[in-house]
Design a protein with these regions (language model features):
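Non-catalytic interface/linker regions that flank or bridge core catalytic/transmembrane domains
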Residues: 1-53
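Divalent metal-dependent catalytic cores for phosphoryl transfer on phosphate-bearing substrates
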Residues: 56-57, 61-63, 76, 81-83, ...
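Surface-exposed loop/turn and secondary-structure junction residues enriched for glycine/proline
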Residues: 53-54, 70
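All-alpha helical catalytic cores of prenyl diphosphate-utilizing isoprenoid enzymes
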Residues: 39-48, 60-72
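Structural motif
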Residues: 30-35, 66, 97-100
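Residue-level detector of well-ordered alpha-helical segments, enriched
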Residues: 21, 25, 36-40, 70, ...
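Generic alpha-helical segment signature
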Residues: 15-19, 67, 149
Length: 184
């Protein structure tokens, strides 16, 4: 059973589509038929907060379930871009080439930020309501680095390869997905 449990950190909950999003995420990974994939999924479901974690502390998708949403958004965007480019490309691909590329898109996009699971910590901080002049506790996200291992691209590659073998292209796509924003 790959249905993730729902955490309720700091009184927040994932949105109503949470379960269907998790099913799409898991189904896409299983569709690659990559050896070890079910073990990786089992790890994500049972040993991490991947499906309820935020994608960041304050920038993109910084809410419960944000990491799942962000990963699916990257996947859909990359898939759409790939198919648009294939239509314009004059060199047709055979079915095996298409399948290999599609599998790499699934793996690279959905797993690029896997290192953010078990990374963010939900807490609260006091914020003054400017209208009422009262202080109130609001949910706040910090982080707790339990596994320092290079930058987050390096760490994602390391975690993924504990379960599945990445192609060179997948490893580079994940490692360098921050592009110009990578710190090293």
């Amino acid at each position: 059973d790959y249905r993730p449990t729902v955490a309720d950190p700091a009184g927040t909950k994932p949105d109503e589509q949470y379960e269907s999003k998790a099913i799409v995420f898991i189904g896409a990974l299983i569709s690659t038929e990559r050896p070890g994939m079910r073990s990786l999924i089992n790890y994500l479901v049972k040993e991490t907060d991947f499906f309820t974690a935020p994608a960041s502390a304050k920038y993109h998708s910084s809410y419960c379930g944000g990491l799942l949403d962000h990963s699916l958004n990257v996947y859909m965007r990359l898939k759409d871009t790939y198919f648009s480019e294939v239509e314009r490309n004059s060199t047709p691909l055979d079915d095996q080439q298409k399948r290999a590329i599609e599998d790499s898109i699934v793996i690279s996009a959905l797993l690029h930020d896997v290192c953010k699971a078990n990374f963010y910590v939900w807490g609260s901080r006091n914020v003054k309501d400017p209208q009422a002049g009262q202080w109130k506790a609001v949910p706040w996200i910090t982080y707790d680095e339990k596994m320092p291992y290079g930058n987050h691209g390096d760490k994602s590659v390391f975690l993924i390869e504990r379960y599945i073998r990445l192609t060179i292209t997948e490893a580079f796509a994940i490692r360098f997905h921050m592009g110009e924003y990578s710190t090293d």
